[in-house]
From Swiss-Prot:
Residues 1-18 form the signal peptide. This is Uncharacterized protein ORF74. It comes from the Viruses. The keyword Signal applies. It comes from Ostreid herpesvirus 1 (isolate France) (OsHV-1). Glycans are attached at N24. Keywords: Glycoprotein, Signal.
Length: 118
């Protein structure tokens, strides 16, 4: 019995050590991970606790964009957008209808965005 417990502990520790994700984040995702490679240090990790709202006047009004988080902090200056399964860089115009609202931050044009096509 003690051998089984020991093997379980070793297997659990090995899994945690091999995990490419920040363990403080719930269900992290990587941008740039379209090729299914493991997340690496410096990858953009996204938490699930965000609010999705449509941005009007976008190239595809049926696409939803979401302001993403990196290590619990809203990210930097340029937009990185997944759109129709391609990574695109897009600079939104500074208009109210191009603004995303999050729980603790207003996303502004130039923030990192993660979008998924619908």
């Amino acid at each position: 019995m003690s051998k089984l417990i020991f093997l379980f502990v070793v297997a659990t520790l090995a899994t945690i050590k091999a995990s490419p994700f920040d363990l403080n984040m719930s269900t992290p995702l990587c941008d740039g991970n379209l090729d299914n490679r493991p997340c690496r240090l410096g990858d953009f990790q996204v938490k699930e606790e965000y609010i999705r709202v449509p941005i009007t006047k976008s190239a595809d009004t049926s696409t939803f964009y979401t302001c993403a988080w990196r290590k619990m902090v809203p990210c930097t200056r340029w937009n990185m957008v997944y759109w129709n399964h391609r990574l695109m860089v897009r600079q939104f115009k500074n208009k109210p209808e191009d603004t995303l609202f999050l729980g603790i931050k207003i996303a502004r044009p130039g923030d990192w965005l993660l979008g998924d096509s619908h």
